[in-house]
Amino acid sequence: MVLIRVLANLLILQLSYAQKSSELIIGGDECNINEHPFLVLVYYDDYQCGGTLINEEWVLTAAHCNGENMEIYLGMHSKKVPNKDRRRRVPKEKFFCDSSKNYTKWNKDIMLIRLNRPVRKSAHIAPLSLPSSPPSVGSVCRIMGWGTISPTKVTLPDVPRCANINLLDYEVCRAAYAGLPATSRTLCAGILEGGKDSCGGDSGGPLICNGQFQGIVSWGGDPCAQPHEPGLYTNVFDHLDWIKGIIAGNTDATCPP
């Protein structure tokens, strides 16, 4: 069984003390407050996702995180403890590969959001650069986000959790999940023995390999963090031309086939 890594909340309360009914980094520890200035929290239609700030006006996340009434929070660490750098934005524009519905578990699960207003760089807000080279199998990768720390029940932290996993050969994921095509524009990452993984509610967040932003959390096994069931991540490097084209104003830019 597979799980797209975003789950519904039963009720959205005030952000300062909300407890979200979604899942997050399994097997991780609290992120250092200074290591994720690019990490954003996305709320929409009673759901939660992550995302990555790539410049002062643009956020990259997963296409399946699209919804109405979207709110994007930047500069956040603790949900309960406000800080002077926290900012709220809403989308001005959203861009997809072909359409908002034309994605699969292995292709085009990517969304580029233009914020309604730019954000200023601060101690807790700063963009993450797009990758300068393709990812390498065997790389150590960092995942991060807010949500449950248990694969079987909702146990939600107030602060984002971080964990290190490995970039695996795509064939490992093909062996784990029936129906994956021979080639795709996704990355396979996890720990073969299990215990560490992204999970529901992490969707759209970053996969950072050897210091470079290489992937977007997309989907994986259910329950999360099981042996020989890694996660699937949209390959950012494969979509660079599309991302750069959209940001430059070419709204006709197309994703790779």
From Swiss-Prot:
Q: Which residues form the propeptide?
A: 19-24
Q: Which GO terms describe its biological process?
A: proteolysis; regulation of blood pressure
UniProt note on tissues of expression = Expressed by the venom gland.
Show the taxonomic lineage.
Eukaryota, Metazoa, Chordata, Craniata, Vertebrata
Protein name listed in UniProt: Beta-fibrinogenase mucrofibrase-5
The Gene Ontology CC terms held by the record are:
extracellular region; secretory granule
Activity relative to temperature: Heat-stable to about 95 degrees Celsius.
The answer to whether the entry has keyword Disulfide bond is yes
Q: How does it assemble?
A: Monomer.
